[in-house]
């Protein structure tokens, strides 16, 4: 009946006398061999496995800390960028409003300059018109005076005869003599 149970331990296939060995055939392993192997793995591998797990844990924690630090830095940079953007918007608004105000001032200055130029041109035109009027009036006066003198001369020529001429000469001679007598 022993043959019917088929135990995985074979007496013929064992190690030579005086030695210890493990059966590496997985289908022929018994529970004791399996317990010994697992016990050795746990005993010998515990320190290595613990070190691996501790190192892995430290690496993960370091990576998490680095990620959190980068997140904080990115958040700070984002806040700074938003603040700079806001400042840029404010500055752009100031520049835009200053530009509009300057444009309005320059527009008003141009309008005022055009008005002043227009007034100066009007005054110059009026001055030129007055000057031309005065010149025309002066020319008319001169022509009237010349014509009046010409008429007077013509009337004097027609009335002036030799007797009147002699009396005028005598009158002026007497006038000169009386002036000489008063100066001596």
Curated annotation (Swiss-Prot):
Compartments it resides in: Plastid, Chloroplast thylakoid membrane
Segments passing through the bilayer: 29-49
GO cellular component: chloroplast thylakoid membrane; proton-transporting ATP synthase complex
Cited Pfam families: ATP-synt_B (PF00430)
Main location: plastid
GO molecular function, one term: proton-transporting ATP synthase activity, rotational mechanism
Membrane topology according to the record: Single-pass membrane protein
UniProt keyword list: ATP synthesis, CF(0), Chloroplast, Hydrogen ion transport, Ion transport, Membrane, Plastid, Thylakoid, Transmembrane, Transmembrane helix, Transport
HAMAP family referenced in this protein's UniProt entry, alphabetically: ATP_synth_b_bprime
Entry's family note: Belongs to the ATPase B chain family.
Note, other: In plastids the F-type ATPase is also known as CF(1)CF(0).
NCBIfam families in the record: PRK07352.1
Role noted for this protein: F(1)F(0) ATP synthase produces ATP from ADP in the presence of a proton or sodium gradient. F-type ATPases consist of two structural domains, F(1) containing the extramembraneous catalytic core and F(0) containing the membrane proton channel, linked together by a central stalk and a peripheral stalk. During catalysis, ATP synthesis in the catalytic domain of F(1) is coupled via a rotary mechanism of the central stalk subunits to proton translocation. Component of the F(0) channel, it forms part of the peripheral stalk, linking F(1) to F(0).
Subunit structure: F-type ATPases have 2 components, F(1) - the catalytic core - and F(0) - the membrane proton channel. F(1) has five subunits: alpha(3), beta(3), gamma(1), delta(1), epsilon(1). F(0) has four main subunits: a(1), b(1), b'(1) and c(10-14). The alpha and beta chains form an alternating ring which encloses part of the gamma chain. F(1) is attached to F(0) by a central stalk formed by the gamma and epsilon chains, while a peripheral stalk is formed by the delta, b and b' chains.
Name of the molecule in the record: ATP synthase subunit b, chloroplastic
Organism (species): Psilotum nudum (Whisk fern)
